[in-house]
């Protein structure tokens, strides 16, 4: 038994369990065009795969003196997002200026960005119940426009 006789302990089996809260695989492909002087337009696609739900261990979900299994966190479905950007450099009254903008999530896709497993430790359960997983969805289409003047 680990520790001193008057200490509580729990053995947690977690060999081979994936890290939660971070995509294990990401890929990004971007392209930029300069069709004429001062103007740029581009897009990039980011793919998120093998992303697992966040989980945590605490005294409230452990059985002291027992061997517990850490369950494989719930796997978030593969997702991706297409973003677009453009900028134009010009002069206003002899001052350098840039007008630029971004469109994030151009295709307005709703996908699970994060997930949370509230209970991932068990003595006898071998799989996470997907009905108990909380989801956080990505924002839909968003955009911003900027005007920068150097003086």
Residue ranges of predicted features:
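Intrinsically disordered, low-complexity regions
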Residues: 8-11, 82, 104, 125
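Transmembrane beta-barrel strand/turn architecture of Gram-negative outer membrane proteins
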Residues: 29-32, 81-85, 90, 98
């Amino acid at each position: 038994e680990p520790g001193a006789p008057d200490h509580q302990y729990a053995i947690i089996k977690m060999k081979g369990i994936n890290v939660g809260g971070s995509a294990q695989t990401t890929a990004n492909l971007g392209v930029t065009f300069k069709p004429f002087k001062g103007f740029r337009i581009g897009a990039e696609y980011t793919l998120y795969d093998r992303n697992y739900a966040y989980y945590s261990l605490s005294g409230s979900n452990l059985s002291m003196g027992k061997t517990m299994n850490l369950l494989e966190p719930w796997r978030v479905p593969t997702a991706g997002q297409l973003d677009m950007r453009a900028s134009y450099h010009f002069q206003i009254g002899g001052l350098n200026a840039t007008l630029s903008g971004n469109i994030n999530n151009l295709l307005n896709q709703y996908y699970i960005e994060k997930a949370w497993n509230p209970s991932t430790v068990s003595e006898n359960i071998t799989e996470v119940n997907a009905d108990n997983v909380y989801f956080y969805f990505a924002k839909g289409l968003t955009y911003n426009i900027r005007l920068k003047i150097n003086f």
